[in-house]
Amino acid sequence: MAIAVAGPEIERLIQLLARLPGLGPRSARRAALHLIKKRDALMTPLASALQVAIDKIEVCKTCGNIDTQNPCTVCTDPRRDPSIIVVVADVADLWALERASATNGRYHVLGATLSPLDGVGPDDLTIDALVARAHDPAVGEIILALNATVDGQTTAHYVTDLLQDANVKVTRLAHGVPVGGELDYLDEGTLSAAMRQRTLF
């Protein structure tokens, strides 16, 4: 018979932390103990930051990014190129592209990729809003920045079919050898994609 070693409040904290990606029950217990030990330095500021996030952060009605203003700072930045829309699966992908300064265009967050096995269909994504944006005369290119997975490629093909009537160029990210990568460590699919998408040097 298991013996309760913590009160219900602490158990609730552990249960909630265990719902975070990458945290199982054991890691959640360690995180909870760390927060409790660092109450003034970490737990109180974290609770405050979470409350601010609850009160102020919202989803951009234009692109699906999260921000403290709506439309978001990316959509309202006059230095951005309004003719380019970069399509990503989720906000984490948008942030990755921004960290890399990979584009000066604007974004569209689908919310996920099509995944029949997980029960994610077209109605679960913001594809209709993307198609509507693609028909804006100011938009000239849609860049599909989706993962090179089966679900990512399925989504890319589905979106491309829906954009055939829009007067836009549809491109996707190149797939292949990563910077600093060694050929011997790459899988066959990556090597094949890199060979097909080779460029002049």
UniProtKB/Swiss-Prot annotation:
Keywords associated with the record: DNA damage, DNA recombination, DNA repair, Metal-binding, Zinc, Zinc-finger
Alphabetized Pfam families for the sequence: RecR_C (PF21175), RecR_HhH (PF21176), Toprim_4 (PF13662)
GO biological process, one term: DNA repair
Known function: May play a role in DNA repair. It seems to be involved in an RecBC-independent recombinational process of DNA repair. It may act with RecF and RecO.
Zinc finger residue ranges, C4-type: 60-75
SMART domains in UniProt: TOPRIM
PANTHER family linked: RECOMBINATION PROTEIN RECR
NCBIfam families: recR
Name of this chain's protein: Recombination protein RecR
Database matches in InterPro entries: DNA_Rcmb_RecR (IPR000093), Rcmb_RecR (IPR023627), Rcmb_RecR_Znf (IPR015967), TOPRIM_dom (IPR006171), TOPRIM_RecR (IPR034137)
Record-stated family: Belongs to the RecR family.
Lineage: Bacteria, Pseudomonadati, Pseudomonadota, Alphaproteobacteria, Hyphomicrobiales
